[in-house]
Amino acid sequence: MGRRKKGRAVSGWIVIDKPAGLSSNAVVGKVRWAFDAQKAGHAGTLDPEATGVLAIALGEATKTVPFVTDALKAYEFTVRLGQATNTDDGEGEVTETSDARPSDDEIRAALPPFEGDILQVPPQFSAVKIDGERAYARARAGQEMEIAARPLYVDSLTFIARPDPDHVTLEMVCGKGGYVRSIARDLGRALGCFGHVKSLRRTWSGPFELSDATPLETLEDLAKDPALDAHLMPLETGLADLPELPCTPEGAARMRNGNPGMVRASDAEYGETAWASYNGTAVAVGTYRAGELHPTRVFQHGAL
């Protein structure tokens, strides 16, 4: 018999407005401790100095993390023009400078090439692996390396404000795997003046918004208090981008055992990923085929 996991079998989502100076994993650790949860994980890393929406899943909700990770996310960020750094943000050393400053119209005109399906080279200081080692570890050791470009979908890149000649604030909505620091670096080069990220805030991630966020201070004040559970959002929130297929009690029982189960008529396409529900409660995620859901993830969070 396997060893019982420590902590409570609590399930759901909580959104934290991550403060600057903490890693995403450090915030996950604080959340897991505060809820005394058996399991916790986040749906998309934020750099330590970045702030904003960090969606964290507890318990059975961790099975829905991939669907939030795959969803679009929005970032508001300020680019410092005229300086390149070795980290592509304000934490690194300045490596190149320029006195050139583009006009607002020149900046707007430079944005469209960064939209749509693009190829992006991650920063030297990033978590991508090069020959089995994290790029940032090699960069800290003074090694320069070539990092292969990676595909990224950018839904939009929008001019927001120009606080002063040295700074421009933009909003980017993109898919998973994007580095805002790389956008700032490459935009600066395209403008002929260099650039790096001065500040970065994630404003939404899939179904989760800043208005859903719990301040870290509240989390710490209510740690181990049952009242903290009131801040949890349902597991089903992480499935918002997938079709919901209501099922019968018999279908739910079959899916709970890992077998295909009957679902009621829906608009889901044959072969589409969807989730089955019974009385609004998620039963399983899987592939829809001819009136049945073939489960790939089954939720065990209470009787149906």
Curated annotation (Swiss-Prot):
The active site is at D47 (nucleophile). Its EC number is 5.4.99.25. CDD domains: PseudoU_synth_EcTruB (cd02573). SUPFAM superfamilies: Pseudouridine synthase. Pfam families: TruB_C_2, TruB_N. HAMAP family: TruB_bact. This is tRNA pseudouridine synthase B. It comes from Dinoroseobacter shibae (strain DSM 16493 / NCIMB 14021 / DFL 12).
